[in-house]
Amino acid sequence: MANYRDRRVGQEIMREVNDILNKRIRDPRVQGITITDVRVTGDLQQATIYYSLLSDLASEQQKAQQGLDKAKGLIRKELGQRLTLYKTPELIFERDESVQYGNHIDELIRKLNQGE
């Protein structure tokens, strides 16, 4: 169970990473990425950043992951300057599947309603 500090640091990282992606990263592969959640370990050494992408194409998702992996160092450096933490957490980017799962559920409900 995450305590208050973990959640607070996660919220700050989410806000700052969104800002960094919008203003500092000029890589076209990361355009249109939205940070949906950040989970921080108890010792604040790792932060798993979940993101969603507007495109459902596998090639676009792979390019976005490559762009984020390439920009990881710059994002971590910027976070270190913006946050007052003893050590900046290591960043791990993972695609958030919940958005696509929600779309799938909506589609199933729509099909059920059409069948009636």
UniProtKB/Swiss-Prot annotation:
Please describe what this protein does: One of several proteins that assist in the late maturation steps of the functional core of the 30S ribosomal subunit. Associates with free 30S ribosomal subunits (but not with 30S subunits that are part of 70S ribosomes or polysomes). Required for efficient processing of 16S rRNA. May interact with the 5'-terminal helix region of 16S rRNA.
What protein is this chain from?
Answer: Ribosome-binding factor A
Recite the UniProt keywords alphabetically: Cytoplasm, Ribosome biogenesis
Record's subunit section: Monomer. Binds 30S ribosomal subunits, but not 50S ribosomal subunits or 70S ribosomes.
SUPFAM superfamilies documented for this protein? Ribosome-binding factor A, RbfA
Places the protein is found: Cytoplasm
Family (UniProt): Belongs to the RbfA family.
- Give the record's GO biological process terms: maturation of SSU-rRNA
Record keyword Transferase present: no
Name the gene behind this protein: rbfA
Which HAMAP family has this protein been placed in? RbfA (MF_00003)
Instruction: Name the GO cellular-component terms.
Output: cytosol
What GO molecular-function term can you cite, just one?
ribosomal small subunit binding
